[in-house]
UniProtKB/Swiss-Prot annotation:
UniProt source species: Thermosipho africanus (strain TCF52B)
Annotated CDD domains: Radical_SAM (cd01335)
Identification of the protein by name: tRNA-2-methylthio-N(6)-dimethylallyladenosine synthase
Cofactor note: Binds 2 [4Fe-4S] clusters. One cluster is coordinated with 3 cysteines and an exchangeable S-adenosyl-L-methionine.
The family this protein is said to belong to: Belongs to the methylthiotransferase family. MiaB subfamily.
Binding site for [4Fe-4S] cluster 2: C146, C150, C153
Domain TRAM: 366-427
Superkingdom assignment: Bacteria
Cofactor entry: [4Fe-4S] cluster
Phylogenetic lineage: Bacteria, Thermotogati, Thermotogota, Thermotogae, Thermotogales
Length: 429
């Protein structure tokens, strides 16, 4: 019997889908190339925004017409639970019960409904999950959940409280992957720099990075996503200490106004955020810092917005993920705050920040012209060019062929834009 997993949302969902595939294949189920070839279609879902939720709910309706067995995992499973049965779903798996997915599939084949939400994270045998969606790169979840409870965010309710994996288990996974051709890893967590705090044994992200950089064949180490007050300068020192650790730090700020930050329950002031960025840049002068910002949060005034503009102008992020605020059912903001910023104003403010960031990107990228950088080749783009990233997470495109994927090359930059950089391969390293 064949299954197909359709993944929505974040990188952690990508990793969870790899885990689910492993457990199903261990029980003899066969992975299909697409949903049309599959007897069972499993949707690994996202509900961070309403649009993402609507998308997978629409897919359920389409699959019902094709008479497929339907399973739902991910944050949508946690949010909607057994209510999904009313939509024709056959089984639902919680974010911490992925190792039990064969049990749910078996029950659905027998015509029974299955809903499994137990915390079975400790059962996951990550050391033997060697089949990844990329041959040279692996997503590695090191901490689950989030304790921060930002007022706009559904994640603590769908992913639970923070729970770290043992460091030895993570390092064994990385070593096994390195022996299987993986050269690049990304450590994942909703709040990755909180890693180890719940273990109460001195474990930390900085110590994990220190041990990981010693593993032979691993050429680049990434991590995301960070929370400002959990980001220790020991992490920055580890980045500065090794050419293996990417000089790319994703540090969501969400807003430039202290009033709005407090309303978001972000637990830091904008002055503290500025000071953190200053300290990071003192330790890692060439650090590439990216961020997230929400536009149009309840009670955001023009003055609040201008403080965000000032933040973006002064810090000059290398990359900025922008989102217009929309209430998410189940969050504190949805329950208690009026969504009182008109849509037209939200859209105008969003457009202004998009244009501002585009100009910043263009200016920052111009400094790359005629430079030679190390790139790990990822894949072919739709344009036909191949692309990869340098140690600062710049996307660089070039002429190449399939044999280069996963290899480290030197590229001389010949053209810059506000987005990708373009260059010529100098040599394979």
């Amino acid at each position: 019997m064949k299954f197909f997993i359709k993944t929505y949302g974040c990188q952690m969902n990508e990793n969870d889908s790899e885990v689910a595939r492993y457990y199903l294949e261990q029980e003899g189920y066969e992975s299909a190339e697409n949903e049309n070839e599959a007897d069972i279609v499993i949707l690994n879902t996202c509900v961070v925004r309403k649009k993402a939720e609507d998308k997978f709910l629409s897919t359920i309706g389409e699959l019902r017409k094709k008479n497929k067995k339907i399973g739902v995992m991910g944050c949508g499973a946690e949010k909607l639970k057994e209510d999904l049965f009313k939509r024709g779903v056959n089984f639902v798996i919680g974010t911490r019960a992925i190792s039990r997915i064969p049990e749910a599939v078996e029950l659905s084949i027998k015509g029974k409904k299955a809903a499994i939400f137990d915390d079975k994270l400790d059962e996951i045998d990550y050391r033997n999950i060697l089949k990844r969606n990329s041959k040279h790169h692996a997503w590695i979840t090191i901490i689950y959940g989030c304790n921060r409870f930002c007022t706009y965010c559904i994640v603590p309710y769908t992913r639970g409280r923070e729970k770290s994996r043992k460091m030895d288990d993570i390092l064994r996974e990385v070593k096994n992957l390195s022996l299987n051709g993986v050269r690049e890893i990304t450590y994942l967590g909703q709040n990755v720099d909180a890693y180890g705090k719940d273990l109460n044994d001195g474990t930390s992200l900085a110590k994990l990075l220190n041990e990981t950089k010693k593993i032979e064949n691993i050429e680049r180490i990434w991590f995301l996503t960070s929370y400002p007050t959990d980001f220790s300068l020991d992490i920055a020192r580890e980045i500065a200490s090794s050419e293996k650790i990417a000089k790319s730090i994703h540090l969501p700020v969400q807003h430039g106004s202290n009033k709005i930050l407090k309303k978001m329950n972000r637990r830091y002031t904008i002055e503290e955020y500025y000071e953190l960025i200053k300290s990071i840049r003192e330790i890692v002068p060439d650090a590439s810092i990216s961020s997230d910002i929400i536009v149009g949060f309840p009670d955001e005034t023009e003055d609040d917005f201008q403080q965000t503009v000032k933040l973006v102008e002064e810090i000059k992020f290398e990359r900025l993920n922008l989102a217009i605020y929309s209430p998410r059912e189940g969050t504190i903001a949805w329950k208690y705050f009026e969504d009182n910023v008109p849509r037209a104003i939200k859209t105008r403010r969003m457009a202004y920040l998009l244009n501002l960031q585009k100009e910043i990107n263009k200016m920052l990228n111009e400094s790359y012209l005629d430079k030679t950088v190390e790139v790990i080749v990822e894949e072919r783009a739709k344009s036909g060019l191949f692309y990869g990233r340098d140690i600062r997470n710049k996307i660089i495109a070039f002429e190449g062929d399939e044999s280069l994927i996963g290899k480290k090359i030197l590229v001389k930059i010949k053209k810059t834009t506000a987005g990708p950089l373009y260059g010529d391969i100098i040599k394979i390293i």
